[in-house]
Amino acid sequence: FGEVYGEARVGLVVPQYVTIHSINELEANKDRFSSEIVGIDAGAGIMKTTDKAIAAYGLDGYTLMTSSSSTMLASLKKAMDKGEWIVITGWTPHWMFDQFDLKFLDDPKKVYGDLEEIHAIAWKGFSEKDPFAAEFFGNIKLTTEELSSFMTAMKDARMDEEEIARKWRDEHRQLVD
């Protein structure tokens, strides 16, 4: 069917109020960040890439902290509540971008690569079996904000997935009609 989302990205993420804009600036500001990059599970691909970024950008004074996603996000919330500087491993799409005012640090050495895409695909004959769904998936294009808001709804939901999807669809009619 084609691209549904064209802003998929991984990298290092900071709150918007942090005044640096590039991974190049981390070393000079390591005291502000307590010399830590807060990450997720040790075996995750983003953690391996962050180890490469630490080497590529000469961030020898930094420690990459392993934790769970939920612990990383709790650390982010705690730091942001206090207005402290924090750098985490991050990716889009993710609901954290709907909940927190965040930005990716520029990666001039492209250690984390370029933007990626999410595509809708289906089995042969799907379009004939469900032409409405095929048209929907062929036409829908989501932004980070739209996809993050849907992911937040799924995370926070106290209802089943179908109800969440219907509610989100009704609130985003311009995307699905």
For the regions a language model picked out, list residue spans one by one.
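Second-shell loop/turn segments in exported
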Residues: G11-V13, S35-A42, D60-T63, A122-K124, ...
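C-terminal functional modules
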Residues: I140, T144-D177
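Ligand-binding cleft/hinge of the Venus flytrap
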Residues: A28-L64, K167-D170
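Periplasmic-binding protein-like
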Residues: V4-G11, S70, P93-T144
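Ligand-binding pocket segment of bilobal, Venus flytrap-like solute-binding proteins
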Residues: I46-P108
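Solvent-exposed loop/turn segments at secondary-structure junctions
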Residues: Y17-I20, A42-I46, T92-M96, F126-S127
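Extracytoplasmic/secreted proteins, especially bacterial periplasmic and envelope-associated proteins
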Residues: H21, E25, G45-K52, T71, ...
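A conserved helix-loop-strand patch within extracytoplasmic ligand-binding domains
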Residues: F1-G43
